[in-house]
Amino acid sequence: MGRALLLTLLAALAAAPLAAVWGISHAQVDDYLGPHRVRFASNFRGEVELNLGPIGNAYLASPVRPIGLSLTVGGVGSASENPDSLFSEQTLIAYTSLYTEPGEVLSGIVEGLVRDAVREGLKAEAVLLLGVALWRLRRRLVAPWIVTTVTRRRAAAVYVAVVALVVGSILVPPKPTDPRHPVSIAEGGQFSSLTVDSLLLANVLDRGIKGIKLLSARQQRAVKTYLDSATGSLSSQLGDLPKPGSGETMILGFSDLHCNRAMAELISRLAHATQPSIVLSSGDDTVNGTAAERGCIRREAAIPDEVPFLVATGNHDSDLTEAQMRTVGMTVLDGQVIDAAGLNVLGDDDPEHNIPFSVDRVKERPESEEEMAQRLVDVARNRHTDVLLVHQPVAARVIMDSPNLPVPLVLWGHYHAESGPAVIMHNDGSWTVGMQQGTAGGVHEPMITSFSTPFSPPLISADVYFYFRDDTTGLITGVQPVHFRPDATVVIEDRIATGDLAKLPLETRIKLGGASATPTVEASR
């Protein structure tokens, strides 16, 4: 038994180099860069190759030679595409992040390629081990003359020759035979080694990169100016910032951030100044839910000051977005009640997802918004729930219309417009507060025309909300919105009272955990 295990381990080690080569050379990921669908595939050609179809190919030295990367862009140069769209401001803006922070944008793609390479490598390892096992059984499976011919020494020699051939071809990749033309505008920058095999593409990229550089500089200046001005406005009102009263828990909530970099930073500064107990997002944290938006999720995850961050993802997010969120420590709600910061939070992701860079939606599961809402209500009736998060108002309407809903706070977004707080009174004198949160990213609708969202200041009011929960009864006694205007002024609204605890019936107060009347908490201003 011990000898068999040792032989298996030796076979696995011998097969590992070939399996690794197979895995790397066969890994691929389909995702988006800008508005175009792209297939990413790793190889050993030692360069990054961008295949733009009939327009030509672009080449860039790989930073991890001899491993290279092939990007095949779909739709470019097709008859259905307007050629002018290649130079439109919207398209250039969509690629700005690739120019300004290529490492951040591509890191999500690379993670996917690594996972696929591991999967392909494990498959190859299994096949090679099967081959070794069959070789060990060769005396039972093949003719004696073959056994005599294929000796261990000859098999080892073949293995060494194959490994040497493979390693040699990797370390000394073939030299390109096609013509290469430098792109002049890339000289001296991070794309200084960029070349193309088409004069047409050289002209396209000269124009495109020049446009991206101008747009990038303009947007970065605008974002910095907005950050500085909004921070100054916020700092001048430190005494008016939301803060909980005695016996209260303060919750920070927002929706539809849509990857806005300026607002992610400002909300982080606001959270640091106010110290909420928990942060909640009702979805649409990204623009398209692509791997390239990994940096957006990383920045958003830094918003809370070491407190729980829970999300009910929206129709612009994706399964990949949810995986990115979990990786950086955010909690993605999935229909189960989660205990966080002493609160029971319930929610689920949107059953509909947008196709990237499109207004079209596809169903991710056979469930309507209304059916999801009713399912969550049923869960809340059987498990104590303090907060219920969904993304779309269609679902929220079903929840808020449920008689005597046993949930003190319901939050949603999607419309990029604030509505509420709505207070629904129940038969026992308690209440539910519902809030349609605006857009924390200050984003115009429809999203299809807002490619610049991650790199621009808010285009409309960017909204953040603070909710005040009475620790004794669990009821929400107030809501305080904070608005970041497009002109960088910050408006801290007065606290809006949502219920009077002194009027709560004694039997309800006892049921909720308060044995005696609790005085109304006045707004702390």
Question: Predicted segment positions?
Answer:
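Non-catalytic terminal accessory segments
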Residues: 1-237, 504-525
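Core catalytic region of metal-dependent phosphoesterases/phosphodiesterases
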Residues: 146, 241, 254, 259-339
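Beta-strand-turn-beta hairpins that frame and shape the catalytic cleft
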Residues: 199-210, 242-251, 336-347, 352, ...
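Acidic/histidine-rich helix-loop elements
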Residues: 211-223, 248-263, 286-291, 354-367, ...
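Extracytosolic and intramembrane catalytic regions of membrane-associated proteins
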Residues: 225-245, 257, 265-274, 323-326, ...
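Active-site metal-binding loops of divalent metal-dependent hydrolases
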Residues: 255-258, 283-285, 315-316, 349-351, ...
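His/acidic metal-ligating clusters that form di-metal
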Residues: 272-274, 341-346, 352-431
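Conserved beta-sheet core of the metallophosphoesterase superfamily
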Residues: 301-303, 307-310, 392-521
